[in-house]
Design a protein with these regions (language model features):
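Core segments of alpha-helical transmembrane spans in multipass integral membrane proteins
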Residues: 15-22, 40-62, 75-86
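Membrane-helix boundary connector in multi-pass membrane proteins
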Residues: 86-103, 120-121
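Membrane-water interface at the C-terminal end of transmembrane alpha helices
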Residues: 110-129
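Non-cytosolic membrane-interface motifs at loop->transmembrane helix junctions
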Residues: 33-41, 72, 96-107
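Membrane-helix boundary elements
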Residues: 3-6, 17-42
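Juxtamembrane helix-break-helix junctions at the cytosolic face
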Residues: 58-70, 92-93
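Membrane-embedded alpha-helical segments of multi-pass transporters/permeases
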Residues: 22, 59, 89, 113-119
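Hydrophobic alpha-helical transmembrane segments of polytopic
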Residues: 6-13, 47, 73-80, 100, ...
């Protein structure tokens, strides 16, 4: 198997599991005989967003271009942190996590904003390698 084919396979696997964890973590882990609580579903959704980020990196890395991989890393950071911010915002507002959840919302939201700024905002003038 060539590297390109392997990374395409890795993209598909990561996208499928990432989406499943993001959208329906309880249903996915129930296939393995595991039961999640509402609070542990939050962790499953966060894992899903990170796995989706890896899918983006794998997809861009399949062609081996340094600039494309770097752009994919920036996009993966934006998507994973943006989704984590939204997931944690919901968990904090609904009381699934305590008040410290607001700190994590700010951290992930700030990171998402930074990834957006350096990908699409005024910081975009930074030359990608």
């Amino acid at each position: 198997m060539k590297l390109n084919s392997f990374l395409m396979l890795a993209t598909i696997v990561a996208a499928v599991f990432g989406l499943a964890f993001l959208v329906a973590p309880s249903a996915l882990v129930a296939l393995y005989g595991v039961t999640l609580t509402p609070a542990t579903e939050v962790i499953g959704r966060i894992a899903g967003s990170v796995i989706l980020g890896f899918a983006i990196v794998f997809w861009a890395a399949r062609n081996g271009s340094g600039a494309e991989v770097f752009k994919a890393v920036m996009m993966a950071g934006l998507i994973a942190n943006g989704l984590d911010c939204l997931i944690l915002l919901h968990a904090t507002v609904t009381g699934l996590v305590n008040g410290l959840g607001w700190l994590q919302v700010l951290i992930n939201g700030g990171l998402a904003a930074g990834f957006w700024y350096f990908s699409f905002g005024k910081g975009k003038s930074v030359v990608f390698p």
